[in-house]
């Protein structure tokens, strides 16, 4: 059965561990190590989930949540809290520090667990498959929902957070905003674009969102950079058509390149939308030109084409 061979269930009961394969059945490429363990997620005790929720709330005020404040929030006895925190730390869902005081912090794996547990509870997804892609700020997984779906986990890096907060206007400019919450903001931004563009532009269909995780439809084909096109001119024209339709709908991608255009050789899809800006933005012309220049440069290098940037800009921005 597909579910038994390719996916690990996120909620009990689980009869045996799924068969492991070194090859992903979707991409036919070696499976990357899975940072998310479905067995850990579905085995979380209700007290451990309560602790994760409390840390999530309190990390909006604290970088390290004081132990006394956490105990008061979760209403567990000191021995019970110590035992449950030990489990969470052992599973790498929570970290602790003793300087300048005893405190605890949620890490990405714990944030993953909360989001996936909630999505499973809503029956948006029922099982987790292999990792099928990884980017600078995201991880992509297969999952089972009503059929095979894609999970995009936004992972804004801790090191790059300050740079992102400066360069991306949707990031909060003041107050305490750890990178896990910046990742949720990035996901919200992309989900907003997918919802608005769905049915107008060739993009993945948004299904659900929870924290930093977007559930979307599976897109056939592969990233443009992995393809050898029989008819590059037709695909280039399709890309311009989709960019033009997005522009007319009020969206400039903001990070368009051969890495976030997908094609099956006949149809194209534009993916990865967290950095979009509206055509009314003060930098809209420069951002649009950069997007189109990336595409034109890629086609020129790989297929020796000679597309004109000014013609592309005029086509996309035509009334």
Question: Predicted segments — roles?
Answer:
Residues 45-73:
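Short amphipathic alpha-helical interface segments
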Residues 35-39, 79-82, 91, 112-223, ...:
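Conserved ATP-binding subdomain of kinase catalytic cores across diverse folds
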Residues 30-52:
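Short alpha-helical segments that sit at the start of domains
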Residues 69, 75, 181-202, 225-259, ...:
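Conserved kinase catalytic-core helix
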Residues 248, 265-319:
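C-lobe/activation-segment region of protein kinase-like
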Residues 82-86, 243:
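Short, hydrophobic-biased segments on the C-terminal half of alpha helices
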Residues 89-98:
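A short, conserved structural fragment
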Residues 41-48, 99-118:
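Short, cationic-aromatic polyanion-contact patches
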